[in-house]
Design a protein with these regions (language model features):
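N-terminal core-binding DNA-recognition domain of tyrosine site-specific recombinases/integrases
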Residues: 1-38, 45, 56, 79, ...
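Basic, Lys/Arg- and aromatic-enriched nucleic-acid-binding interface segment
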Residues: 14-18, 22-24, 37, 41-43, ...
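Proline-centered turn/helix-capping motifs that create local helix->coil transitions or kinks
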Residues: 36-44, 107-117, 121, 151-168, ...
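C-terminal catalytic core of tyrosine-transesterase DNA break-rejoin enzymes
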Residues: 37, 86, 90-97, 190, ...
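Catalytic-site neighborhood detector that most strongly recognizes the C-terminal catalytic loop/helix
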Residues: 53, 57, 119-121, 235-261
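Active-site/catalytic core of tyrosine-dependent DNA strand-transfer enzymes
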Residues: 61, 65, 144-205
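Short, polar N-cap/turn motifs at the start of nucleic acid-interacting alpha helices
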Residues: 105-112, 205, 226-248
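C-terminal secondary-structure termini that scaffold catalytic or DNA-interacting sites
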Residues: 110, 123-138, 145-147, 153, ...
Length: 271
């Protein structure tokens, strides 16, 4: 299977990257893990495959000006897209983790969200919701009073839409970001596509993507003085060394004065 994937071409006619092959393998492994959990198969053969390590590209972390322009652009977006992207920036959660969020995962008193599952798109409209791969992936993230107001406002809108259009009550196990008229979560690729449209429409760097919001959250934590272990725990990394390897440049860059300006813009504009 992997050899066939490596022979494929992307939309630009170029060979697919090794990281893409790994993403495909992860999706297949998730399905097989579920089959093993349900005693359909005894072992997950996908976990026995050793893949070569890939060179990690330095991520484009938005500048202060880019963050401000992005916030302005998000203010014009439909509510569910706006909440999704702001939540990604505020918590550092992955696309799949946000897509798999249910209302029962929110603790309003503690202002916390239990990250305990992830949504993976398989093919077409099929989507698979799975548990975190590691213990560190099952975690709690916290949000501000401003984010609480935004989430409560969003929940009221979801209550109204579910009552009027679905003719039922909003359940605690409903997904926060749900396909209208169904109980299925929206797919991560939907938010990827929309984000690209936002970037293009507002003249923002095309190097940015939804995962850049996770990097932004991490950079702001680092700029705010959080240590590596704390950031690793919030992001769901198994080892603090993973966090350090990814954000070593961010640690250096965000020690500079612009980081303070970025935190200020976060405090007033980004919930």
């Amino acid at each position: 299977m992997l050899s066939q994937l490596r022979k494929r071409k992307n939309r630009r006619g170029q060979p697919v990257r090794e990281s893409t092959v790994q993403h495909y393998l992860s999706a297949v492994s998730a399905v097989l893990s579920d089959a093993k959990r349900n005693e359909i198969i005894q072992t997950n053969p996908a976990r026995m495959i050793d893949l070569p390590t890939t060179n990690r590209m330095e991520q484009h972390i938005p500048t202060v000006q880019e963050v401000q322009r992005l916030l302005q652009a998000l203010s014009m977006e439909p509510r569910h897209f706006r909440v999704f992207y702001l939540l990604a920036m505020a918590t550092g959660c992955r696309r799949g983790e946000l897509c798999a969020l249910q209302w029962q995962d929110i603790d309003w008193e503690q202002r916390s969200i239990h990250i305990c599952r992830s949504a993976v798109k398989i093919t077409g409209d099929e989507i698979f919701v799975k548990e975190p791969k590691t213990r560190s992936g099952d975690r709690y993230v916290y949000f501000s009073a401003q984010m609480e107001n935004l989430l409560r406002e969003y929940r009221r809108a979801c209550l109204y839409i579910t009552t009027i259009y679905d003719e039922r009550e909003l359940d605690t196990n409903d997904f926060l970001f749900r396909r209208q008229g169904t109980r299925l979560p929206m797919t991560p690729t939907t938010f990827t596509w929309r984000f690209k449209c936002i970037l293009k429409k507002n003249g923002l760097p095309q190097e940015l993507n939804v995962h850049s919001l996770r990097h932004t959250a991490a950079s702001l934590m680092i700029a705010g003085g959080a240590d590596v272990a704390t950031v690793a725990g919030i992001l769901g990394h198994s080892q603090p060394s993973t966090t350090l390897n990814i954000y070593i440049h961010a640690f250096d860059k965000n020690k500079k004065p612009p980081a303070r300006a970025c935190r200020k813009c976060w405090r007033y504009d980004i919930v």
